[in-house]
């Protein structure tokens, strides 16, 4: 967008020169009726450069016009600006919008204009007197402001009467005049500013055709609804003000039109003339200096022997000083050349070329002694932690300080590489310095390892088992007791597709059938259990309330793997929907469950999950409470397949079907003394 420097000859916009013989909308017809005087009337008071600014500008102009009628315009602005009464400010803005339109409509009648100014003066006096405080007559109705509101209603009625007397009873002329005298001139000025041109009279008179036809039809439909509503319910300041406010949105309809104009149809922008004076380089402008980024990718092959080795890092470490290659092959991993990892006197050589702009990093090689069950990572004493650019992935051996908690062997075989990667949390592995003299580091966060087999430079994923890494006390010399406890509880290496759990995981075991690794939030359902008093008043909704508790209890924990959590959430939402209509529909569908084998299989799966819930005993107690206090088991399992499966999962012996412990107190002796009150059911004394 280039703004013109000097006045340009008129530009005829394409598609705007032909005379419009048929009008698509009433809005276009209203404008065409005054087309002969279009050139003279298209000179509105509102000036701006952006189409979307028009509604705010017209509101500000309306407030200014109203406040000018008062004795102190600045005081009125201060009262209005500092007020927190939203409803009162909205009422004043509606009155101001209609008042300004009435001033334009009565410009030819001095008497009507005098009456308007009098109404405006009285209205502004009420604003000063009221102060637009919390209890304001301009806001919602209050008994304290009844007299002041009666005065405001009288002023609004006078304003409408003045408009009707000067428009022949046709209030629609206000919107037509607003569009013709304010909206279209504003659109013309925005076009001239944005395109750097001057519109000729014919183009200015055809601005209506720029408005999107579909949007214009919507405006026309709203006009018809407004007229019909006025005929049925009469006129009011608020209704008329909102109708005028709708017309101020017309400029917004042009934003998409401007974006769809082809580039070859736009007028050539005016190029500013060069400033006077000598121009260096023969008048040629110096081109801006660009930034060149050269990326060299080395596609050389890595040679890997078949000796036993474990590389638990994307970065390979050796004893000598080595280089970090700033270019990477997959845009996400940094490689280090000339690396060697020693495990059981076997070594692996990986060589790669690097670019000239690589940086140097010094570290000591990682060594593992399987006989002492210790894992140490020695590094230079100048650094307390490994740089996060290559950290997060460290070298750990297959026999490193690991206690196998499974029955399968976790020994590494020939031609296998164990690669440790960050967990799903995306956190970088941290290293805590143990001894500043020996510069030893220990693993401080959980790591996840994946086994890969190496065969002719090809890697194949292998399954592995769960191992717990617990540092020995000899490794933790000089570390505080708090840090020791944290490391011993958190150091877990997950190397397979089983769900690994820590020692303090509340015994959530992998017994959830197809949802391996599923964990639930602890005690999250307690907030949904109603009190005993409330249970007495939900006898007709006991089923939904109880299933809501079960649905909350089955909410997966954030530590559950995302694919498992997503799959189980889908099953939970289908069988236990959080919608009474869907729940009733599912109950009706389950009335003939034999015709829906897939649904029956899903119910059995959910029942199995409930059976192995770690807090099943607590949920069974809640079910017993619902049965006694809310009459839950009055709805027998024969008539509610979903409820019966949930109760069977919690209470495996089926005692809830006929046991007296699961009967509501309403079905026991003395039920004839139960009375219904406002706050529920009570026993007569």
UniProtKB/Swiss-Prot annotation:
Gene Ontology cellular-component terms listed: extracellular region
Entry-linked InterPro entries: SipA_actin-bd_C_sf, SipA_C, SipA_chaperone-bd, SipA_N
Gene3D superfamilies: Salmonella invasion protein A, C-terminal actin-binding domain, SipA N-terminal domain-like
Sequence segments annotated as region (Disordered): 265-386, 402-432
Pfam family, one: SipA_2nd
Origin species: Salmonella typhi
Cell compartments where the protein resides: Secreted
Biased composition annotated in UniProt, kind: Low complexity: 291-304, 417-429
Keywords of the record: Actin-binding, Secreted, Virulence
Family: Belongs to the SipA/IpaA family.
Renumbered residue ranges of the record's region Actin-binding and polymerization: 497-669
GO molecular function, one term: actin binding
Polar residues composition bias: residue spans: 369-385
Protein name: Cell invasion protein SipA
Keyword Ribonucleoprotein in record: no
Task performed by this protein: Actin-binding protein that interferes with host cell actin cytoskeleton. It stimulates actin polymerization and counteracts F-actin destabilizing proteins. Potentiates SipC activity; both are required for an efficient bacterial internalization.
Keyword RNA-binding among UniProt keywords: no
């Amino acid at each position: 967008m280039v703004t013109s420097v000097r006045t340009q000859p008129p530009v005829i916009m394409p598609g705007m020169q032909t005379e419009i013989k048929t009008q698509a909308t009433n809005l276009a017809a209203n404008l065409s009726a005054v087309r002969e005087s279009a050139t003279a009337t298209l000179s509105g008071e509102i000036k701006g450069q952006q189409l979307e600014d028009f509604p705010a500008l017209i509101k500000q102009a309306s407030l200014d016009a109203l406040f000018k009628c008062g004795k102190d315009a600045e005081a009125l602005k201060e009262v209005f600006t500092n007020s927190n009464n939203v409803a009162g400010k909205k009422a004043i803005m509606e009155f101001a919008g209609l008042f300004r339109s009435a001033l334009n409509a009565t410009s030819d009648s001095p008497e009507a204009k005098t009456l308007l100014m009098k109404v405006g003066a009285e209205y502004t006096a009420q604003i000063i007197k009221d102060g637009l405080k919390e209890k304001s007559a301009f806001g919602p109705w209050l008994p304290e402001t009844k007299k002041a509101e009666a005065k405001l209603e009288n002023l609004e009625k006078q304003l409408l009467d003045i408009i009707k007397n000067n428009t022949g009873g046709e209030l629609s002329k206000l919107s037509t005049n607003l569009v013709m005298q304010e909206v279209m001139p504003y659109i013309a000025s925005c076009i001239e500013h944005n395109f750097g041109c001057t519109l000729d009279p014919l183009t200015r008179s055809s601005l209506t055709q720029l408005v999107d036809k579909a949007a214009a039809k919507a405006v026309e439909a709203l006009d018809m609804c407004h007229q019909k509503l006025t005929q049925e319910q009469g006129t009011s300041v608020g209704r008329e003000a909102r109708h005028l406010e709708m017309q101020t949105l017309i400029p917004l309809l042009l934003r998409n039109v401007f974006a769809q104009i082809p580039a070859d149809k736009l007028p050539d922008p005016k190029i500013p003339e060069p400033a006077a004076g000598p121009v260096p380089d023969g008048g040629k402008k110096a081109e801006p200096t660009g930034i060149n980024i050269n990326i060299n990718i080395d596609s050389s092959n890595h040679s890997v022997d078949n000796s036993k080795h474990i590389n638990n890092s994307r970065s390979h470490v050796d004893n000598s000083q080595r280089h970090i290659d700033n270019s990477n092959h997959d845009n996400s991993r940094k490689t280090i050349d000339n690396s060697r990892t020693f495990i059981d006197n076997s070594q692996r050589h990986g060589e790669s070329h690097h670019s000239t702009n690589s940086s140097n990093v010094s570290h000591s090689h990682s060594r593992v002694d399987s006989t002492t069950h210790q894992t140490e990572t020695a590094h230079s004493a100048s650094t307390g932690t490994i740089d996060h650019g290559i950290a997060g992935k460290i070298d750990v051996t297959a026999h490193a300080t690991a206690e196998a908690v499974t029955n399968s062997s976790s020994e590494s075989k020939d031609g296998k590489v164990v690669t440790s990667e960050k967990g799903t949390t995306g956190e970088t592995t941290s290293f805590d310095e143990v001894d500043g003299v020996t510069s030893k580091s220990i693993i401080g966060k959980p790591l996840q390892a994946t086994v890969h087999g190496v065969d002719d430079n090809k890697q194949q994923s292998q399954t592995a088992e769960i191992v717990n890494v617990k540092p020995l006390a000899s490794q933790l010399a000089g570390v505080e007791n708090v840090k020791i406890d944290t490391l011993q509880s958190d150091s877990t290496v997950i190397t397979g597709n089983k769900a690994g759990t820590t020692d303090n995981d509340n015994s959530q075991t992998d017994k959830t059938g197809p949802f391996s690794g599923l964990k639930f939030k602890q005690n999250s359902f307690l907030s949904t259990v109603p009190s005993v008093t409330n249970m007495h008043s939900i006898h007709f909704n006991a089923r939904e309330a109880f299933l809501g508790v079960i649905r909350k209890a089955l909410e997966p924990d954030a530590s559950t793997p995302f694919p498992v959590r997503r799959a189980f959430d889908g099953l939970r939402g289908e069988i236990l929907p959080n919608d009474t209509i869907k729940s009733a529909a599912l109950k009706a569908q389950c009335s003939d469950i034999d015709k829906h084998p897939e649904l029956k299989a899903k119910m059995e799966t959910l029942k199995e999950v409930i059976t192995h819930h770690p807090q099943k005993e607590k949920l069974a107690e809640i079910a017993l409470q619902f049965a006694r206090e809310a009459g839950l088991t009055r709805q027998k399992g024969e008539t509610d397949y979903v409820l019966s499966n949930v109760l069977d999962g919690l209470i495996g012996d089926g005692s809830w079907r006929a046991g007296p412990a699961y009967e509501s107190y309403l079905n026991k002796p003395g039920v004839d003394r139960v009375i219904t009150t406002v706050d529920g059911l009570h026993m007569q004394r």
